[in-house]
Amino acid sequence: SVGFKAGVKEYKLTYYTPEYETKDTDILAAFRVTPQPGVPPEEAGAAVXAESSTGTWTTVWTDGLTSLDRYKGRCYHIEPVPGEADQYICYVAYPLDLFEEGSVTNMFTSIVGNVFGFKALRALRLEDLRIPPAYIKTFQGPPHGIQVERDKLNKYGRPLLGCTIKPKLGLSAKNYGRAVYECLRGGLDFTKDDENVNSQPFMRWRDRFLFCAEAIYKAQAETGEIKGHYLNATAGTWEEMIKRAVFARELGVPIVMHDYLTGGFTANTSLAHYCRDNGLLLHIHRAMHAVIDRQKNHGMHFRVLAKALRMSGGDHIHAGTVVGKLEGERDITLGFVDLLRDDFIEKDRSRGIYFTQDWVSLPGVIPVASGGIHVWHMPALTEIFGDDSVLQFGGGTLGHPWGNAPGAVANRVALEACVQARNEGRDLAAEGNAIIREASKWSLELAAACEVWKEIKFEFKAVDTLDPE
């Protein structure tokens, strides 16, 4: 008939297309959908596809001015979640033309910007995204990547060691710099600003940068190793953030830091471009991630945030510990650690990976294990994360009974012992405690650390677990 048919029609008539064959250029999404009672899964899945692409609640005559078939998102497959009543995984394909090139901001605004408040859904979670190579090639990605970082630091064949300076708020710049020096001098590769250290009344950013640079150069001169401190450039405006990064570059330090979720993807991508152009490494903290990713049935899984960060740009990102005080189940954590580091990752539902992901030539990101870890965890961390990682001990360095430098010595000795044992073919998982005990005979600092933390464990069940097979 001529003209258009006004009124409301079911989403599934247009947006549920089980016969659709996905294209190599489509962005694919896996959503965990919990429909409201009485809403069939096909309608719920189609609603997700519609509301995150071309749809609106009623038919509009301007639909006739474009080709919906070319631009609409399509829900092409739905499967029930085993062990959960009323939960479904809905797979949605989005045509590449819906997205601005090189903009994580636009990608998220489209895919998750509006649909999560949709009334027909009780809850909605984005579990995974497949980013096609055609879209990945529009991003610069990490400023440098894993291999370039190793070459800049001249450190190979072992994980890197870090430490967050505590107390995170309240120290003066000079005392802060002193703690940085002691940790680096003791044997750590990096120290770190906490995520909420920006430029507060008790310590303005410029003073901190100067004292930390002094600490770095002094520790480098005394140890003959390249050292770094993650200078947090996060600020209230984009211009101020870049100003801080420029000052860090002028001081000649190797690395700056950004809180990418609170700072925002637009600011983060700008900073990543600046860092590549000017030879700075970029450490990323994921402050605010648990607001988005912790609930199992609503929000966005961290593996999606991790993929987005690799596209936006960062050389390090915090990725849980598996063994410390912060959330992270082993298989799931290793799944997104591989997504950060490797060039090509096969679909593997047992690790929560819903799609095969090809990163083509985008550099990798080093995962950072941080939060409630100490020397007794070293064998497990070395085994789980391997060489391309940063192991970060805040309290596990600064809480040493003899002070900061001995705390750093203890961590470095423990790490070197674990790496040597692994290279000799010993089983770190089975012999970990024995390896640490042997090493502590040769290091009084390590022996003291072993004594303090011998019984500390953070044993709680993970909130976000895999579905039963």
Swiss-Prot record:
Substrate binds at N114, T164, K168, R286, H318, S370. Its main location: plastid. Binds 1 Mg(2+) ion per subunit. SUPFAM superfamilies: RuBisCo, C-terminal domain (SSF51649), RuBisCO, large subunit, small (N-terminal) domain (SSF54966). It is found in: Plastid, Chloroplast. InterPro entries: RuBisCO, RuBisCo_large_chain_AS, RuBisCO_lsu_C, RuBisCO_lsu_C_sf, RuBisCO_lsu_fd_N, RuBisCO_lsu_N_sf, RuBisCO_lsuI. Its cofactor is Mg(2+). One of its GO terms (biological process) is photorespiration. The keyword Metal-binding applies. Keywords: Calvin cycle, Carbon dioxide fixation, Chloroplast, Lyase, Magnesium, Metal-binding, Methylation, Monooxygenase, Oxidoreductase, Photorespiration, Photosynthesis, Plastid. One of its GO terms (cellular component) is chloroplast. The modification N6-carboxylysine is found at K192. Its EC number is 4.1.1.39. It catalyses: 2 (2R)-3-phosphoglycerate + 2 H(+) = D-ribulose 1,5-bisphosphate + CO2 + H2O; D-ribulose 1,5-bisphosphate + O2 = 2-phosphoglycolate + (2R)-3-phosphoglycerate + 2 H(+). Mg(2+) binds at K192, D194, E195. The record marks K325 as: Transition state stabilizer. The active site is at K166 (proton acceptor), H285 (proton acceptor). GO terms for molecular function: magnesium ion binding; monooxygenase activity; ribulose-bisphosphate carboxylase activity. HAMAP family: RuBisCO_L_type1. Belongs to the RuBisCO large chain family. Type I subfamily. Heterohexadecamer of 8 large chains and 8 small chains. RuBisCO catalyzes two reactions: the carboxylation of D-ribulose 1,5-bisphosphate, the primary event in carbon dioxide fixation, as well as the oxidative fragmentation of the pentose substrate in the photorespiration process. Both reactions occur simultaneously and in competition at the same active site. This is Ribulose bisphosphate carboxylase large chain. It comes from Tabebuia heterophylla (White cedar). The gene is rbcL.
